[in-house]
A protein has these predicted regions:
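Alpha-helical hinge/cap motifs
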Residues: 6-9, 82
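The conserved beta1-alpha1 loop
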Residues: 5-6, 51
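Amide-donor transfer/coupling interface in amidating biosynthetic enzymes
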Residues: 2-4, 11, 17, 28-43, ...
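Gly/Ala-rich beta-loop-alpha elbow adjacent to hydrolase catalytic centers
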Residues: 63, 78, 82, 87
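A short, Lys/Arg-enriched amphipathic alpha-helix followed by its capping loop at the start of a domain
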Residues: 18-24
């Protein structure tokens, strides 16, 4: 079963639906309605997805604690706020984006042969809803960049993968209607298949 941590985002159940389409059961819990103890002893997930949300990682309930507790035990995927939370949990700094992107489609790169991008083209369009990003200068060395986009001719991190553990983050929204359903579902399916 996959645990989907809901950061009070309207797209959370789009993610849940994509997970269900793979045949994997999903349990959705709000970021302030569970505990590490409950996750370990009662829920016992095989993987964890951390949803988008309207706040910062500091305001995302249990998310950073979950990442710190489970990163070396279970595969984790963070989407948007979840991606930022992964960066921050490992020491990255979350900063205001130079360009705010709410409901905008951008071209993403597919770099470094990430398992979650397996079967995707080298460039694909995806939807962005964010005003925060991981500062590239602060990206912990334990991560590699698996996706970028360009804003004002500057690279913006759109995807990261831990070098030693199956921990992934995507800043864009694979579950948004503005992202090709084929590509969005493929990312979720690839993660579920790990």
């Amino acid at each position: 079963m996959i645990l989907l941590i809901d950061n009070y985002d309207s797209f959370t159940f789009n993610l849940a639906h994509y997970i269900e389409e793979t045949g994997m059961p999903v349990k959705v819990l709000r970021n302030d309605k569970t505990s590490i103890k409950e996750i370990k002893s009662i829920i016992k997930p095989s993987k964890i997805i951390i949803s988008p949300g309207p706040c910062t990682p500091n305001e995302a309930g249990i998310c950073i604690d979950v990442i710190k507790e489970f990163y070396n035990k279970l595969p984790i995927l963070g989407v948007c706020l979840g991606h930022q939370s992964i960066g921050q949990a490992f020491g990255g700094i979350i900063v205001q984006a130079k360009k705010i992107m709410h409901g905008k489609i951008s071209s993403m790169t597919n770099e470094n042969n990430s398992e979650i991008f397996k079967g995707l083209p080298k460039k694909f369009d995806a939807t962005r809803y964010h005003s925060l990003v991981i500062d590239p200068k602060s990206l912990p060395s334990c991560f590699k960049i698996i996706s970028n986009t360009k804003d004002n001719d500057k690279d913006v991190i759109m995807g990261i993968e831990h070098n030693d553990y199956p921990v992934f983050g995507v800043q864009f929204h694979p579950e948004s209607i503005g992202t090709s359903k084929v590509h969005g579902q493929k990312i979720i399916s690839n993660f579920v298949s790990l």
